[in-house]
Structure formats: structure tokens, C-alpha cells
Amino acid sequence: MEVDYLTSLPRRIHLIVDEGAKAGASRPALTDERGIVWSYRRLIDTIEAVAGDLARLGIRPGDRVMVVGENSIGAIVLMYAASRLDAWAVMTSARLGPHELDAIESDCKPRRVFYTHGISAEADAAACRRGAEAESFTGIGAIKVGKLEASAVPEEVYEDPARQVAVLIYTTGTTGRPKGVMLSHRNLA
């Protein structure tokens, strides 16, 4: 019997977490930066709530959502919450310099920029430089949020997971400007 493995994969990356919960929602899904163990149920509930928070802040399907931070529960939840909305997560390191962050923001034209300032002095400095203000997010606490970019044009949304972009990652180096790499849900699932 032949199995088409591609069609058996989750259609969106946030559904990977849902798949993990099928073996037991109370099982550990991950351990955060404070050493707190998150169950699949808690993670799923938080992702759903933060997706609602993003929508309340004006994030639409096809928008780019830039996240400036360190590896943290906030960054993980923001990425999966963007997936729930069919928005593109643009994950960037807070350790990049101001010119690199500005170049990435200028290139990807995000609807909003989110800064995981609570665990990163660098993310907080970047947020302060851009005039971002703290907002409370369900389950992950305060995240600094940049202004709504009303002129941001959303990308087309595709049902096909091979065509729908999940994450836009920028490469950086010592020469040249950062370059964006679009990874689809199929690339990541």
C-alpha cells in the first residue's frame, strides 16, 4: 500500500501542535525560557488567544508580522498565531544591529512589528528606538508592539500549503543587504 506522505502532513504549521496534542493534550509540548513546562493544551489555547489578539491589533490574512526577539515562548506563540491567521511570520534576532533590522523591515513591509522585550535587552532597545508600546497578550504577557502600518498590502493567501508562505527568514552576512527566504507551510511541516 502506497501512502502519500505530503497529503498526510498538516496544512499549516500551527496544526503541528494540534497533531502533537492528539496523543494527549496534557503531555508536555515544550519548556519555556523560565523552565516552565507547557502542555499541548496550554500551548494551543495560548496560540488561539494570541491569534485573536493579533487580529484585534489589525493583523489580516496575508500580512507580514515581524517578530524581533530571542528564542522564547513569546516568539514561538507569535509565529504559530500568525499561522492561524494565514499571516507571514518574519522572525528576526534582536541581536541584529539597528541598520539590519531597519533594512529587513523596509524590505518585508510588515503590518506590525512585535518585540519580545521582557527577555531581551536588545529587543527592548529596538522597541524603544521605534516607539513601540507594551500590549498585554493572553498567556504570554507584555510584548511591545510597533505602530500599525496602514499602507501594508497583504499578500495573496493560498489554500495549498506548498504555496502559502508561513515564515520569511532573512539571511545576514558581512557583505550585502539581508535577503529574505520565503518558507511555505509545506517546507516546514
At which residue positions do the language-model features occur?
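N-lobe entry segment of adenylate-forming
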Residues: 1-38, 42-57, 61
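Structural core segment of the AMP-binding/adenylate-forming
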Residues: 56-57, 84-159
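Conserved AMP-binding A3 loop
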Residues: 37-41, 166-189
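Conserved pre-ATP/AMP-binding loop-to-beta segment of ANL
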Residues: 10, 25-26, 151-170, 177
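Surface-exposed loop/turn positions
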Residues: 28, 63, 87, 163-164
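Conserved AMP-binding/adenylate-forming
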Residues: 36, 51-99
